[in-house]
C-alpha cells in the first residue's frame, strides 16, 4: 500500500530540490527590487520513492517593504535626565540602534551614518549584520548632528533619523562636544544642586590649585551615558578625576564602579567625595566595614577632621551636617598600599561616634607584579551641601584637594 512520505520543494531561485516532511514553512525570498515575482513548486513522494510528475506551482508577486531604523530605547539622553536642552559630551560618543523589516531583518544589508551633513558623499557604510552601534572618537568641539539610515538588499532605504531631533520633545535640541581642558576632570554627580552652588565652590578650588579654567567639568545629571565605552573614554582623557556626589541621594557613581576601577587600574587618580556609601563591596575601594557616625543625622560645626599627613591640612566642619554619614575601615588585603588621610577627632558633647574613626583613605592596587595602579581616595564627609561649603572652618576645605593634585597624585 502506497504511503505519502514527504515532499520536495523548490523556489525559482533555487538550483536543487529540497526534501521535507513538514506541511508548511516560512521562507525568505531574495527580493532585489521594489516589486519582484517568485514561483514556488512542490511535489509529493511516497514510500516507493515515486515522485509526483506534475508539481503544484504558485506564482507570487512580492512587493518590497522599506526597512526601519531607530535609536535604541534610552540610548540618547532625555531632557528630564540632563535638565536642559543641550546634551554635553567630550570627544567620544557612541550611538546604538535597532533595525526592523517586514521582509525579515536579514534583508537589511547596510547601515549608513553621517555627521553634520547628509550630502551624497558624506555617508559612511557599515555592515548591518556586524554593527548595531558606532563609537565616534576625536570629535571636534562644538555643536553636531548625527544622521543614520538603513538599506535593504533591494536598495530600499529607511527614513533618516537624527540626534538631536528638534521634533522629539523628550530629547535635547542640541548636542555639544566640549573641548578637553587641562588634565583634571571635575565630575558633578549632584543632580539636586540645580543652582550649581557646589560646582562653583569646587571650580573655585580648582581655579586656585590649577589656574583659571585649567580643568574640565562634567555635569552628569540623573543618568550616566548609555554606553559604558563613553564613560570610560571620558575618564581616560584625564590624569586626575575629582568626583563629588549628592548630599541627599540621587548620585550615579555606584553604576560607574567598573569604569572607575578600570580607570584607576590603568594609572588614573581619582578623589571620590561620597556623602552616602551605598555599598561595602566597592570594587574601586574595597571596604572591610562601614558604620554610621551620627545615627541621629547631625554632626555639629566646629568638629575637626584630623589629617594624618600634616596638621596644616586639618579641617573643621563649618556648618551643620544634617544627613547620616559613615566612617569606614578599608579592606587592606585588597590593596597593595593603603594610607589613612583623615580621622574624626575625639567625640565631643552630643557626638555619637566613638574613638577616632577613619573618614578618608588613599589606596593603590597591584595591577601586575611590577606595577601599581593609580591612586583612589575615598572621603565620606561631604565637602558641600549644595548651599554652603561644610569643611571651611579652618581655612578652605579645598586645601585638601590642592594637596591631592599637587602632591599625592604626582
Segments from the language model and where they lie:
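Solvent-exposed loop/turn segments flanking beta-strands in beta-repeat/beta-sandwich domains
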Residues: 1-13, 100-118
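Extracellular ligand-binding/catalytic regions of CAZymes and related secreted enzymes
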Residues: 350-410
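A glycine-rich, often tryptophan-bearing local segment used as a flexible ligand/cofactor-contacting loop or short
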Residues: 247-345
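Hydrophobic/tyrosine-rich beta-strand signature of extracellular beta-sandwich/beta-rich modules
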Residues: 38-44, 144-150
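Surface-exposed, short loops/turns at beta-strand junctions within beta-sandwich domains
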Residues: 29-37, 136-143
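Helical hinge/lid and interdomain linker segments adjacent to catalytic or ligand-binding clefts
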Residues: 194-282
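Short beta-strand segments within Ig-like beta-sandwich modules, predominantly Fibronectin type-III
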Residues: 16-25, 122-130
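Short, solvent-exposed loop/turn segments at the edges of extracellular beta-sandwich modules
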Residues: 45-51, 151-161
Amino acid at each position: 500500500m502506497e504511503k505519502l512520505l514527504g515532499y520536495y520543494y523548490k523556489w525559482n531561485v533555487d538550483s536543487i530540490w529540497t526534501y521535507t516532511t513538514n506541511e508548511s514553512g516560512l521562507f525568505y525570498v531574495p527580493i532585489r527590487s521594489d516589486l519582484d515575482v517568485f514561483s514556488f513548486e512542490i511535489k509529493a513522494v511516497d514510500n516507493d520513492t515515486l515522485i509526483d510528475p506534475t508539481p503544484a506551482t504558485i506564482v507570487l508577486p512580492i512587493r518590497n517593504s522599506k526597512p526601519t531604523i531607530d535609536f535604541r530605547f534610552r540610548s540618547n539622553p532625555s531632557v528630564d535626565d540632563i535638565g536642559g536642552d543641550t546634551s554635553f559630551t567630550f570627544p567620544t560618543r557612541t550611538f546604538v540602534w535597532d533595525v526592523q523589516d517586514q521582509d525579515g531583518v536579514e534583508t537589511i544589508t547596510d547601515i549608513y551614518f553621517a555627521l553634520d551633513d547628509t550630502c551624497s558623499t558624506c555617508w559612511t557604510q557599515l555592515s548591518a549584520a556586524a554593527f548595531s552601534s558606532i563609537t565616534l572618537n576625536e570629535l571636534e568641539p562644538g555643536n553636531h548632528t548625527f544622521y543614520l539610515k538603513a538599506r535593504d538588499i533591494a536598495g530600499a532605504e529607511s527614513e533618516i533619523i537624527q540626534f538631536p531631533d528638534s521634533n522629539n520633545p523628550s530629547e535635547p535640541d542640541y548636542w555639544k562636544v566640549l573641548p578637553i581642558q587641562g588634565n583634571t576632570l571635575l565630575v558633578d554627580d549632584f543632580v539636586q544642586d540645580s543652582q550649581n552652588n557646589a560646582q562653583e565652590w569646587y571650580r573655585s578650588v580648582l581655579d586656585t590649585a590649577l589656574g583659571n579654567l585649567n580643568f574640565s567639568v562634567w555635569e552628569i545629571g540623573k543618568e550616566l551615558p548609555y554606553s559604558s565605552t563613553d564613560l570610560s573614554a571620558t575618564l581616560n582623557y584625564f590624569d586626575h578625576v575629582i568626583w563629588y556626589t549628592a548630599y541627599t541621594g540621587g548620585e550615579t557613581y555606584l553604576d560607574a564602579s567598573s569604569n572607575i576601577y578600570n580607570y584607576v587600574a590603568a594609572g588614573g587618580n581619582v578623589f571620590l567625595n561620597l556623602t552616602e556609601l551605598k555599598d561595602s563591596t566597592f570594587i574601586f575601594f574595597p571596604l572591610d566595614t562601614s558604620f554610621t557616625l551620627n545615627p541621629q543625622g547631625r554632626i555639629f560645626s566646629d568638629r575637626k577632621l584630623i589629617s594624618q599627613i600634616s596638621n596644616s591640612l586639618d579641617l573643621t566642619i563649618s556648618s551643620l551636617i544634617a544627613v547620616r554619614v559613615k566612617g569606614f575601615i578599608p579592606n587592606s588585603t585588597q590593596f597593595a598600599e593603603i594610607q589613612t588621610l583623615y580621622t574624626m577627632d575625639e567625640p565631643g558633647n552630643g557626638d555619637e561616634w566613638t574613638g577616632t574613626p577613619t573618614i578618608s583613605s588613599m589606596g593603590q592596587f597591584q595591577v601586575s607584579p611590577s606595577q601599581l595602579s593609580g591612586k583612589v581616595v575615598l572621603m565620606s564627609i561631604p565637602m558641600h551641601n549644595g548651599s554652603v561649603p561644610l569643611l571651611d572652618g579652618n581655612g578652605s576645605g579645598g586645601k585638601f584637594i590642592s594637596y591631592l593634585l599637587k602632591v599625592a597624585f604626582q
